[in-house]
Amino acid sequence: MSGLDKNLHIVVLMGGWSAERSVSLMSGAGVADALTERGFTRVTRLNMAHDVAAKLGELKPDVVFNALHGTPGEDGTVQGMLDLMGIAYTHSGCATSAIAIDKELTKAVLVPHGIRMPKGKVVDSASLYEGDPMPRPYVLKPVNEGSSVGVAIVTEGGNHGHPISARAEGPWKHFDRLLAEPFIRGRELTVAVLGGEAMCVTELKPKAGFYDFDAKYTDGLTEHVCPAEVPPAIADSMMGMAAAAHRFLGCKGASRSDFRWDDELGEAGIYLLEVNTQPGMTALSLVPEQARQKGIAYGELVERIIAEALSPGQAG
């Protein structure tokens, strides 16, 4: 039990205007419902809008549960605002959020610490119409989006022309800066970290295509195997990498690290893809699922995240 005062004024900040707005609304509703069910008497749901600072100034919360996903709630913007206002908030601070949302910056921090990540290059979307940035197959993803928004797998002789033609309707067309990475064969896995401790490994098995936005948030489109059926050494390695990434980036509260594992290469085939500092808290989300596997109910998970936000030295 967290021992939190049930009279704390908790504002659950959700919604916003990113491509992940719908997910944020689901996460926020789940958090607010759980707090109310656990006896918290002052829970306010706040839909993120451009007057958010004025609203928070009126509400004067003791703590904000940041249930936003994508910009501006996951890139350090909202975190910086809350720091300036002197309001405690959940999850990672301003600098960590700004680094982790940018996949190129994340690599710059983690790779020197020995964390294996795919080698890639940043390209602008217009250059794709001149030719492929690297040999196929490769993955294209926006530099600073989450939830697999805008991700495309470009295959040899496959889905988007050769070179990508101006007529190709690829998801990259909505973004200026893209990260191109070699496609890594194998299995999709993820590790949640809570309070600095890795919980377990989940394998994600989409029933069609890859683990994109729809597969993540549509019930029945992806099988979650939790805990993943992988050798203990592989699970330990992934959990160690996730905990290290959480620490080196300076994450707080909960984070989630996504991996690809080429199982033909053993431990040498483990690649960290990205670290999510604002992981989903919906009914289908992976952090609550792994918490349940560890015997932590959803409501307790929410309280633990808030308790860390209110701990001495945790602000921002």
Regions found by a protein language model. Name each.
Residues T44-A49, L178, P182, K252-E264:
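A short glycine-rich, hydrophobically flanked beta-strand micro-motif that places a catalytic Asp/Glu
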Residues V43, A88-Y89, M117, Y138, ...:
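Hydrophobic beta-strand scaffold residues
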Residues V123, V151-G157, V193-G195, D262, ...:
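Short beta-strand-to-turn element immediately C-terminal to the catalytic PLP-Schiff-base lysine
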Residues N159-G240, E267-Y271:
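Phosphate-binding site of ATP-dependent enzymes
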Residues D5-L8, G114, P231-G316:
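ATP-dependent carboxylate activation and anion-phosphoryl transfer catalytic cores
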Residues M1-A95, I99-I101, L105, P112, ...:
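ATP-binding N-terminal substructure of ATP-dependent carboxylate-amine bond-forming enzymes
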